[in-house]
Amino acid sequence: RAGTGKTYSVEKGLKDEGLVADEDYMIVSGAVSVIMMYKKMFQFRTKTLVFDDCDAVFRDENGRNILKAALDTKKVRRISYLKKSGLVFDPKDFEMDPEGEFMAIENGLVPAYFDFAGRVIFISNLNKDKADPDGAIRSRSILIDVNPDDATLMQRIETLLPYLEPTEMALKDKKEI
């Protein structure tokens, strides 16, 4: 359900843990292609990635497969993207040239495979069966279904009001709005 404070709660939780945006975690909001999701997973391979309303990857078989690899239950997961792409290089091509591999990464390329030890959080308003029809992603995840009734939603909004902009506005005025 939209408007339930999912994004706010995730961001607050990350900050409360002392994590720093764009260093310890990154929030990707809106659209993301499969190859860019893969690239972000490489860049944050030991950190936390939050995909907020990036629902298109659920409809793409390659996106779902990369997610399944990233969400596997092993501590370290091997993720690969072995399709032709100008953004991907084969690490085997640089076995004798570590500096060349470093330069490829510095130039924005990503290896065709890498070990992932990070965490992924997806925030979506999609129905769980629509986002994950076969249940493969859910079987590798913790799903928190946020679909409160109207009374619970109003209670949640009242809890969040003091923290919402403009913070200097009186609480009674925010409640009236």
Task: Locate each region found by the language model.
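Conserved catalytic/switch belt of AAA+ P-loop NTPases
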Residues: 59-116
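Alpha-helical scaffold elements adjacent to nucleotide-binding pockets in ATP/GTP-utilizing enzyme cores
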Residues: 9-13, 40, 62-70, 136, ...
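A short helix-turn-beta junction within AAA+ P-loop NTPase domains corresponding to the substrate/partner-engaging
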Residues: 23, 116-118, 131-154
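Loop/turn-to-beta-strand initiation segments
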Residues: 45-49, 77, 112-122
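AAA+/P-loop NTPase substrate/partner-engagement loops
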Residues: 4, 16-48, 55-61
